[in-house]
Amino acid sequence: MSKISNALGRKDGNSGYTRVVGNAELGQLLSRVQATVISNGNELERLITQRCNLIENIDVFIEDTTRGNNVQNGVYLCLKKTFKKSKKYAESVKGIEPDMLIFIVESYRVCKVIELKDGDAFDTKKSQGEKEHLEKFATLFGAKIPFVTDYYICSFNQNDKKLIMAGFKGVFSLEHILTGKELCQILGISYQEILDIRRRDTEENFAYLIAEMMKIPEVREEVKKHF
């Protein structure tokens, strides 16, 4: 989980939060909370990738796998930033790259095209756009590699696939939905470990937010009215 203590937020005192609450200090603090929420997706990806077998060069990996050049059976993860450096595959799918690609190398070869979400509720237009990009990427990229390829949307923090489907306005069918636990099972990493780390960060965020709020004189005065 990202930490409020590390977030900058708006420094000019003119954030929407300041206009809503009428207090520059509180508005700036709330803008830091929002910045933390936005950065949570990147922090989640970092926690996942730290525990995986990362592909450093997708072109070399696919060529070595195809030719049987010392690629051991296992599960490998390719991030968007790595894929975008590809000289063989990136151009035809430019602008629709997914967050991650999981390659399973066994007696069969599978590529899972995955968009990772920290939340689970999106509007219809955004949901439809996500699906169209995933479908197109899986079709175009899948046609060029010797892997059975399919796409998935993953809502890491929701364990009920039907609720995920509802959150994406029914755009994704159940077979194209992954929970966070399922994603971690595929990658061979501990879902619970990631939850525990994020839970500790959540507790720290709560304590930090309250402490920072109580530094604001107007907040302290308002709190006194209720006790």
Swiss-Prot record:
<keyword id="KW-0540">Nuclease</keyword>
<dbReference type="GO" id="GO:0009036">
    <property type="term" value="F:type II site-specific deoxyribonuclease activity"/>
</dbReference>
<dbReference type="GO" id="GO:0009307">
    <property type="term" value="P:DNA restriction-modification system"/>
</dbReference>
<protein>
    <recommendedName>
        <fullName>Type II restriction enzyme HhaII</fullName>
        <ecNumber>3.1.21.4</ecNumber>
    </recommendedName>
</protein>
<keyword id="KW-0255">Endonuclease</keyword>
<keyword id="KW-0680">Restriction system</keyword>
<comment type="subunit">
    <text>Homodimer.</text>
</comment>
<keyword id="KW-0378">Hydrolase</keyword>
